[in-house]
């Protein structure tokens, strides 16, 4: 399914141990600590590999996440807001990542700008509960989705670089 670079990136992300979601207040704090450590490691590895492509932060409870993701195409940076909520059944249920400004612009997206991860990512997530976390969601979910969809949307003229919008 994944190319060698993706396999390498994912193998360098720490696996999570705590099987807890937001309903379990005490264990959720431990799970969040693991999530942050894995995300930090993934971002650090991406920076070393000159592949830095997102920033995330969460609300105080760790149940709502938001930030920016970007994709470089023909040496131009396309930046998008990204957001998702942690489902109450997390980690059994993967979060649904949304890029609101792309809502309705591709068939591989649900209402509200939620990207389609059903065919490839969700079965992989299900096989790896509770070891996979948000860093894995980014590496195996959003990253590949951006790599396929953004160049296609650019080639169709649906996504236009901000410098070209004013022309």
From Swiss-Prot:
GO cellular component: cytoplasm
Xref: InterPro entries: UBQ-conjugating_enzyme/RWD, Ufc1
CDD domains per record: UBCc_UFC1 (cd11686)
Keyword RNA-binding carried by entry: no
GO-annotated biological processes: protein K69-linked ufmylation; protein ufmylation; response to endoplasmic reticulum stress; reticulophagy
Active site: 116
Superkingdom of origin: Eukaryota
GO molecular function: UFM1 conjugating enzyme activity
SUPFAM superfamilies: UBC-like
Record keywords, A-Z: Ubl conjugation pathway
Family of the protein in this entry: Belongs to the ubiquitin-conjugating enzyme family. UFC1 subfamily.
Subunit structure: Interacts with UBA5 (via C-terminus). Interacts with UFL1. Interacts with UFM1.
Function: E2-like enzyme which specifically catalyzes the second step in ufmylation. Accepts the ubiquitin-like modifier UFM1 from the E1 enzyme UBA5 and forms an intermediate with UFM1 via a thioester linkage. Ufmylation is involved in various processes, such as ribosome recycling, response to DNA damage, interferon response or reticulophagy (also called ER-phagy).
Protein name listed in UniProt: Ubiquitin-fold modifier-conjugating enzyme 1
Lineage: Eukaryota, Metazoa, Chordata, Craniata, Vertebrata
